[in-house]
Amino acid sequence: MAGNRSIITLECKTCKERNYTTTKNKKKTQDKLALSKFCPRCRKHVDHKETK
């Protein structure tokens, strides 16, 4: 059985490119995930938000 973790995609807030995939626990983290990651298109660290 898979469990409570689901695969999500992280999208750059400035250029809207989907750069990263990760997993998150649906029960413990119900709100949208936002992380500061490096965007190769923008060539700098930018906030990335969760998309489906």
From Swiss-Prot:
Repressor in keyword set: no
Please provide the Gene Ontology terms (biological process) for this protein. translation
Q: Which GO terms describe its cellular component?
A: cytoplasm; ribonucleoprotein complex; ribosome
What are the protein's GO molecular function terms? Answer: structural constituent of ribosome
Pfam families membership: Ribosomal_L33 (PF00471)
Query: What keywords were assigned to this record?
Result: Ribonucleoprotein, Ribosomal protein
Q: Does the keyword Transmembrane helix apply?
A: no
**Do you know which SUPFAM superfamilies this protein is assigned to?**
Zn-binding ribosomal proteins (SSF57829)
In the record, the note on similarity to other proteins reads: Belongs to the bacterial ribosomal protein bL33 family.
What is this protein's record name? Large ribosomal subunit protein bL33
